[in-house]
Amino acid sequence: MERREEQLGAAGAGAAPALDFTVENVEKALHQLYYDPNIENKNLAQKWLMQAQVSPQAWHFSWQLLQPDKVPEIQYFGASALHIKISRYWSDIPTDQYESLKAHSFTQITRFASGSKIVLTRLCVALASLALSMMPDAWPCAVADMVRLFQAEDSPVDSQGRCLALLELLTVLPEEFQTSRLPQYRKGLVRASLAVECGAVFPLLEQLLQQPSSPSCVRQKVLKCFSSWVQLEVPLQDCEALIQAAFAALQDSELFDSSVEAIVNAISQPDAQRYVNTLLKLIPLVLGLQEQLRQAVQNGDMETSHGICRIAVALGENHSRALLDQVEHWQSFLALVNMIMFCTGIPGHYPVNETTSSLTLTFWYTLQDDILSFEAEKQAVYQQVYRPVYFQLVDVLLHKAQFPSDEEYGFWSSDEKEQFRIYRVDISDTLMYVYEMLGAELLSNLYDKLGRLLTSSEEPYSWQHTEALLYGFQSIAETIDVNYSDVVPGLIGLIPRISISNVQLADTVMFTIGALSEWLADHPVMINSVLPLVLHALGNPELSVSSVSTLKKICRECKYELPPYAANIVAVSQDVLMKQIHKTSQCMWLMQALGFLLSALQVEENLKNLHSLISTYIQQLEKLAEEIPKPSNKLAIVHILGLLSNLFTTLDVSHHEDDHEGPELRKLPVPQGPNPVVVVLQQVFQLIQKVLSKWLSDAQVVEAVCAIFEKSVKTLLDDFAPMVPQLCEMLGRMYSTVPQASALDLTRQLVHIFAHEPAHFPPIEALFLLVTSVTLSLFQQGPRDHPDIVDSFMQLLAQALKRKPDLFQCERLDVKAVFQCAVLALKFPEAPTVKASCGFFTELLPRCGEIESVGKVVQEDGRMLLIAVLEAIGGQASRSLMDCFADILFALNKHCFSLLSMWIKEALQPPGFPSARLSPEQKDTFSQQILRERVNKRRVKEMVKEFTLLCRGLHGTDYTADY
């Protein structure tokens, strides 16, 4: 045992001599893989066996492992090794051995025809790979030969065994072609050869399928074989007889699944639409399945109904345009559409009672697109036929979207509820799309139904029906501009009449109100009809998401109409926040809603509400600042800081966001005096510093503090100016004590907004120099532990160069050290950090001429940068980053041409750099290409992509075909 493990260990490490790959050692390794309880030994054996499979010795041992006295596991490995050698190492085989390899493969398949099925399949795959490698020149009639050899009467295997073995071989042949690694030009030749060879396959399949004496196992194999071959894009008319036979086989329960798969694959081939006559012949066959479909639905046979639906949808969805064009056959196509409608409306609740209806939704998109793509006159004709169909579809979809009874829904698993939620979203998307076909009449239709339902005194309505109709409105109103609609006022009037006794209905009422918030902004008189419902729902934790998101939408869209309701909204919101009814994320949304609301108030009113809203939190924060740090306190601090951040994110009394809304927007006059947010921030600044002093080493707290100021800066812009000096001072102290990425991100915001203003340049320059100095010290200690800090630092440097290059002219800035650290950052394993570093260099290099210190350091250390870039392209960095490195090369070429032309030749001189796979000619070509291209950045990116593939040995492989 020890001896074996030593051998396997050595082989696993790549140190074993080739002689170790013997039959005996392979068998021992397989025994270890299957039966050794030690997982490390299993992994070791697996690694060794993978090496054995690709070794030259595999040609020898694979045949020996197939001997009759071996167990199936060993035989399977032998067959797999044979397949790997044939498919990947075909060039190893001398031409004169092709025939013996072929004959030996046939012999083994014949022997295993009555043996292990998994071994038989692997051997068939191996022979299929061999055939593909030899076709068409070395083996021009491969498929016909296979059929002839297996039909020979002198075989020792019984006819059924031979038949099944042949069918297995014919089945895997197209599958192996689809996954083969054949070069593109060979693939075309082999595909053409196989298309011709199907003439030897289909008559055999037809005969076996229609022969009454064929056993079920053979017929099933025939259908699978046909299914495999049609994916080679065989002309649909050549498949006609087999498709008809497959339709007949649908009546046999044992053959049903295989028949469905074969029919769907045949119909779904992209080329099939060319054969319109064949498609027209298929419609009656599909329509002939309606009785079987109805019976299946009646008997709760989900598998059968699912399969028949797949067939109908495959025909309708893939060929609706071709079939619509056949005007004289419009009635048969309409019958197919109605059959698909039946599948859409199949009884029962998805996904518990049925899983079929979801298959049909894409068909309705396709049909609508095809109808609307016709020229106006033809479209009008089809609209006349299909508008009633689409109105019926809306009714069907809304019925399918209905919730089950509360009792039934209570028994559903969480997974079933989630699937139903996704299904309803799909229905919502479909309704939104159908609106394009039906227009305003669809809204009127929904409104009439809802009105009749809510005002009828004859019978009590179900909440499910009401909810579904509202859901239809919501689906459309969320994405379509319904401001012109004459039914929305009536709908808003109906909503308060809805008797809400159910969470799902209440949720949909909320979301519908939210979807109509833009309409409410244009019709403020209606706000009072629905706002009380929303505020009432805020107090229900089960309606947390819907009520808070709806209030946020109303506050955002209708903020200039809300001052009369502001006191009530703030009071209700404060109450639910204090009672902790909502989860953290909803609390944050609620604060954003209040930020929108307060933005529209006069300054005095704003400050009054603001103090009322946050005073409790400030008191809690003061108390927490006095206490010894502990985990529960940290959660509370981060929560309070998060609430303030989200409030300040949207509290914009200067209405900066509205600047993009257009001149027609009703704006309040810009208030005079200090900004309320700045007033509050100045009041709590000392408190925040006190909190920081105790939590400075905690990244989450520091991040939460920075978020308050970062979001305030983004919202307030120039209004934040009074805070700049003290914030710069605080950030400097924070970063000097414990460097954190969030502090650098906030510094970047300050540079972006205020660095260009002379009054603010001194504190920002001081902060920039300080954080740069601290970060450079971090590089000396070992920056690899802080990729987030390096990432943020590189982004800060790039922003400084972009916004205020003067920051790089300061004598106290060590530009050389910054440059060297950025080169080091290019070698980080983290992609975002590398990307940020590349971004810094693409901003720095254009400044060579205007900033003396930058020009000097590029002249001295630019070669080091180029080598780092070439190393990355040579294989040290991810291929996804090549565009970023190409940007650096382009910038070097554009702004430092004379230096680059000297450096690149020197850098590429050493053998094996940047990759041992490159020839001197390839390196020379690359350098010349780069130096020639100083205008077209896209071309440089293409050159770099080509070069990196050469460096990695991937050029011209299928692996990089889409790269």
From Swiss-Prot:
Residue stretches making up the Importin N-terminal domain: 45-111
Positions annotated as HEAT repeat: 24-54, 56-88, 95-135, 142-179, 194-231, 236-268, 276-325, 330-372, 375-438, 440-476, 487-522, 524-558, 562-600, 603-648, 676-716, 720-754, 761-803, 815-845, 860-893, 897-931
UniProt entry keywords in alphabetical sequence: Cytoplasm, Nucleus, Protein transport, Repeat, Transport
Pfam family, one: TPR_TNPO3_IPO13_2nd
Induction section of the entry: By cortisol.
Expression across tissues: Expressed in fetal brain, heart, intestine and kidney.
UniProt GO molecular function: nuclear glucocorticoid receptor binding; small GTPase binding
UniProt keyword annotation of Transport present: yes
Gene Ontology cellular component terms for the protein in this record: cytoplasm; NLS-dependent protein nuclear import complex; nucleus
Keyword Repeat among record annotations: yes
Cellular compartments annotated: Cytoplasm; Nucleus
Similarity comment text for this entry: Belongs to the importin beta family.
Entry function: Functions in nuclear protein import as nuclear transport receptor. Serves as receptor for nuclear localization signals (NLS) in cargo substrates. Is thought to mediate docking of the importin/substrate complex to the nuclear pore complex (NPC) through binding to nucleoporin and the complex is subsequently translocated through the pore by an energy requiring, Ran-dependent mechanism. At the nucleoplasmic side of the NPC, Ran binds to the importin, the importin/substrate complex dissociates and importin is re-exported from the nucleus to the cytoplasm where GTP hydrolysis releases Ran.
Protein's name in the database: Importin-13
Recorded name of the encoding gene: Ipo13
